[in-house]
């Protein structure tokens, strides 16, 4: 194998791995609010394949820099709400609050079919803390659900057009609104990094150059 062919093979393998990594993780911004301005990224939700086959991991991060200061103590997320694909309801008992494990903070619990407030409506699941257990980072794992994928948890309730995720975030400065907490929601996909697109474009050009070279021989 010549150097050109080997380079093309390495590039193809690298792009495949990058594509696989991207396929195994999806991220969304919560950029809507009933208290602060819409269109600002207030929190980021990442859903990914777990380390254990079949598990799905959630990471929910409050983007602290988006909030008016000074921040209180404690500041952070107090609830987080999300949905699942209703196809997972079969077989009966396939999915429920008991499938959500390894919650951190560990004082939080899971409730079902709760209203997120702020006009954002009901969600299938809500991870819930309290005023003293607010957090800037929530993580948990969904385990033991047959047939789910990361996409099973990125949709509106019952497949509708509502927001995918919602959170109650509290403890920021009152600012001009007079409030120190609000409801936040969103389903805006985080853009794929430009480097991935550039790499993919480069690989396509490399493949075209190789074909032209072969045709000229």
Place the predicted regions along the sequence by residue:
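Bacterial N-terminal signal peptides that target proteins for export
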Residues: 1-8
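Bacterial N-terminal signal peptides
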Residues: 11-18
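A short, hydrophobic C-terminal helix/tail in secreted or cell-surface proteins
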Residues: 191-209
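Detector for intrinsically disordered, low-structure N-terminal pre-sequences
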Residues: 9, 100, 189-191, 216
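Positively charged, low-complexity intrinsically disordered regions
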Residues: 7, 184, 211-213
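Sec/Tat signal peptide C-region and signal peptidase I cleavage site
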Residues: 19-23
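C-terminal membrane-anchoring or membrane-association module
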Residues: 207-217
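Mature extracellular "passenger" or substrate-interacting domains of secreted, surface-exposed proteins
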Residues: 24-189
């Amino acid at each position: 194998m010549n150097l050109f062919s080997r380079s093309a093979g390495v590039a193809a393998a690298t792009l495949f791995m990058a594509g696989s990594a991207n396929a195994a993780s999806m991220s969304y911004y919560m950029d809507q609010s009933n208290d602060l301005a819409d269109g600002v990224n207030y929190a980021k939700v990442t859903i990914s394949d777990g380390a254990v086959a079949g598990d799905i991991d959630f990471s929910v991060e409050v983007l602290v820099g988006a909030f008016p200061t000074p921040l209180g103590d404690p500041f952070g997320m107090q609830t987080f709400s999300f949905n699942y694909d209703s196809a997972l309801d079969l077989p009966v008992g396939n999915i429920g609050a008991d499938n959500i494990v390894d919650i951190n903070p560990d004082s939080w619990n899971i409730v079902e079919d709760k209203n997120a407030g702020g006009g954002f409506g009901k969600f299938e699941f809500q991870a819930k803390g309290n005023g003293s257990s607010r957090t800037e980072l929530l993580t948990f794992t969904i385990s033991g659900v047959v047939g789910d994928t990361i996409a099973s948890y990125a949709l509106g309730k019952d497949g509708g057009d509502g927001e995918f995720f919602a959170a109650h975030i509290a403890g920021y400065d009152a600012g001009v609104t007079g409030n120190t907490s609000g409801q936040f929601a969103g389903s805006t996909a985080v853009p794929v990094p430009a480097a991935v697109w550039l790499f993919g474009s480069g690989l396509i050009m490399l493949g075209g150059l190789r074909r032209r070279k072969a045709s000229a021989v």
